[in-house]
């Protein structure tokens, strides 16, 4: 009778621990799946390297990968936004200052869009993400267009815009994968 009680207790404990295990382990993305997602961007190699360089992608599910991609895009956009704001304050050329102000506003809006995406990821509102991705992308493209008229680009804003556009394309790919599930 004692062994039945012990067996029952061990079984019960096992069931409890298995139900507590995070769902990430059962839906972990393989390297092949990450490469397949990255193949939908304009640079598979850079996308894959970038995602795999983040330690959070070691054992991640599709939602986690999308969250990592949003974090990477947000981090880069915030860094560039700060740089642009510093040039707004330093510039003595009124035309260039206005271009920097316009781009700063675009980056502010793009960062807001990325934060909204992050909230949608947390809440599971995946179908709402594509609109925010497009909005964020459009904001960066607008900065690129406005900055295209600048005669000098000492801060390499055009190149930095391309980096953020690429990161947003990764967000688009990783999040669009979620809305199919």
Locate the predicted segments by residue.
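Terminal membrane/secretory targeting segments in land-plant proteins
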Residues: 1-29
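Folded extracytoplasmic luminal domains of secretory or organellar precursors
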Residues: 24-181
């Amino acid at each position: 009778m004692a062994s039945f009680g012990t067996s029952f207790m061990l079984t019960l404990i096992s069931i409890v621990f298995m139900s507590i295990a995070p769902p990430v382990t059962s839906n972990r993305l393989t390297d092949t799946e990450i490469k397949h997602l990255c193949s939908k961007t304009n640079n598979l190699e850079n996308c894959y390297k970038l995602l795999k360089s983040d330690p959070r992608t070691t054992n991640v599910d599709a939602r986690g990968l999308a969250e990592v991609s949003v974090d990477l895009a947000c981090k880069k956009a915030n860094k560039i936004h700060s740089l642009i704001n510093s040039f707004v304050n330093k510039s003595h050329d009124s035309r260039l200052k206005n271009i920097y102000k316009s781009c700063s506003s675009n980056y502010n809006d793009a960062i807001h869009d990325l934060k909204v995406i992050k909230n949608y990821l947390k809440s599971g509102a995946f179908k709402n993400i594509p609109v925010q991705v497009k909005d964020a992308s459009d904001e960066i493209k607008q900065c690129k267009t406005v900055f295209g008229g600048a005669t000098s680009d000492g801060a390499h804003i055009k190149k930095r815009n391309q980096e953020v556009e690429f990161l947003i394309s990764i967000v688009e790919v990783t999040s669009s994968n979620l809305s199919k599930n």
